[in-house]
Amino acid sequence: MSSGNAKIGHPAPSFKATAVMPDGQFKDISLSDYKGKYVVFFFYPLDFTFVCPTEIIAFSDRAEEFKKLNCQVIGASVDSHFCHLAWINTPKKQGGLGPMNIPLVSDPKRTIAQDYGVLKADEGISFRGLFIIDDKGILRQITINDLPVGRSVDEILRLVQAFQFTDKHGEVCPAGWKPGSDTIKPDVNKSKEYFSKQK
């Protein structure tokens, strides 16, 4: 795995690349296009594989939930945009993706994967890296899975909601926090209000 330039609390590495958009067209997009929105940017190893379509379809199927949070989901792999399009045009029952509600970025030179520290250099593919970038372009969360295990869309939604809550209210979110749950005031005395309710 490459070390990369992605660091929590710092600007996310910028990129410009060709993507297959939800309308099936090719378009050059960059991270800066999404300034003012949260971005969930996730890498997957390869098109036409096994775990990858389950993750991509899960994110695509719930793209509207992210959109309601002013959050754009973007997928990326080292495959060409032509390969992405062929996979999108392959029926789900044949291992394809079917129509997508999220852009899929092409990173054939592996520069984006390297910048984000997810390149598995010996195979020339990406680990399952996922990055939550806030509306100011600051990297707030990083997870990187080894190849055989997919990610949870529920957890990513929860994390986006939690970061947005802390941005807005200045309180911090305890383990397992969900919207509507108690939060903690980040102050020695005021935090007792939360802890006094614990069993």
Curated annotation (Swiss-Prot):
Catalytic reactions of this protein: a hydroperoxide + [thioredoxin]-dithiol = an alcohol + [thioredoxin]-disulfide + H2O
One record GO biological process: erythrocyte homeostasis
Processing after translation: Phosphorylated on Thr-90 during the M-phase, which leads to a decrease in enzymatic activity.
CDD domains attached to this UniProt entry: PRX_Typ2cys
Residue list for modification Phosphoserine: 32
EC identifiers of the protein: 1.11.1.24
Cross-link Glycyl lysine isopeptide (Lys-Gly) (interchain with G-Cter in SUMO1), where in sequence: 185
Annotated compartments: Cytoplasm
Keywords of this entry: Acetylation, Antioxidant, Cytoplasm, Disulfide bond, Isopeptide bond, Oxidoreductase, Peroxidase, Phosphoprotein, Redox-active center, Ubl conjugation
Modified residue annotations for N6-succinyllysine: 35
Modification N6-acetyllysine occurs at: 7, 16, 27, 35, 136, 197
InterPro entries: AhpC/TSA, Peroxiredoxin, Peroxiredoxin_AhpC-typ, Peroxiredoxin_C, Thioredoxin-like_sf, Thioredoxin_domain
Record-annotated Thioredoxin domain positions: 6-165
Molecular function terms from GO: heme binding; identical protein binding; peroxidase activity; peroxiredoxin activity; thioredoxin peroxidase activity
Crosslink site: Glycyl lysine isopeptide (Lys-Gly) (interchain with G-Cter in SUMO2): 7, 120
General remark: The active site is a conserved redox-active cysteine residue, the peroxidatic cysteine (C(P)), which makes the nucleophilic attack on the peroxide substrate. The peroxide oxidizes the C(P)-SH to cysteine sulfenic acid (C(P)-SOH), which then reacts with another cysteine residue, the resolving cysteine (C(R)), to form a disulfide bridge. The disulfide is subsequently reduced by an appropriate electron donor to complete the catalytic cycle. In this typical 2-Cys peroxiredoxin, C(R) is provided by the other dimeric subunit to form an intersubunit disulfide.
PANTHER family for the chain: PEROXIREDOXIN-1, THIOREDOXIN PEROXIDASE
Name the UniProt record assigns to this protein: Peroxiredoxin-1
Name of the gene encoding the protein in the UniProt record: Prdx1
